């Protein structure tokens, strides 16, 4: 969860402080990578839904995880934001991360996935690999 009265930058700095492994430069670069301005002085509560979504993704990315689990990462994003998320997912995979995406947008999932597992009513209904 993010603190409403803090900027996106300050929220990420707070999270980074808990890990003590993430530099100010990493935070700055991650905010830029998700399309947020690191110098934006607006507080989190004034962010649009799309900006909040981007900040959540930035929080996950800044840790440079080996496993990244994204639940509906395209929610509240415009076309440009969806393309940016797809590019970031591909980049993470190229860097060796395993990325798991849960999403109702089948076209998006297929565009970023090596393997697509379709689940309906709690059961696997198909597995498609590239």
PLM region descriptions:
Residues 13, 24-39:
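Conserved ABC ATPase "signature" region
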Residues 57:
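Hydrophobic anchor residue at the start of the ABC signature
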Residues 64:
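Conserved catalytic motifs of ABC-family nucleotide-binding domains
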Residues 68-72:
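Catalytic Walker B motif of ABC-type/P-loop ATPase nucleotide-binding domains
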Residues 79-80:
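Helix N-cap at the start of a conserved alpha-helix in ABC-type nucleotide-binding domains
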Residues 103-104:
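H-loop/switch region of ABC-family ATPase nucleotide-binding domains
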């Amino acid at each position: 969860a993010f603190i409403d009265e803090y900027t996106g930058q300050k929220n990420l700095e707070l999270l980074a402080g808990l890990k003590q492994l993430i530099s100010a430069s990493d935070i700055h670069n991650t905010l830029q990578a998700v399309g947020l301005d690191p110098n934006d002085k607006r507080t989190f509560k004034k962010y649009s839904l799309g900006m909040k979504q981007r900040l959540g993704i930035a929080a996950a990315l800044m840790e440079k995880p080996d496993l990244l689990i994204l639940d509906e990462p395209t929610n509240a994003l415009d076309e440009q934001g969806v393309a940016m998320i797809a590019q970031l997912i591909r980049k993470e995979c190229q860097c060796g991360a395993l990325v798991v995406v849960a999403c109702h947008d089948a076209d998006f999932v297929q565009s970023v996935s090596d393997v697509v597992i379709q689940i309906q009513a709690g059961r696997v209904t198909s597995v498609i690999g590239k």
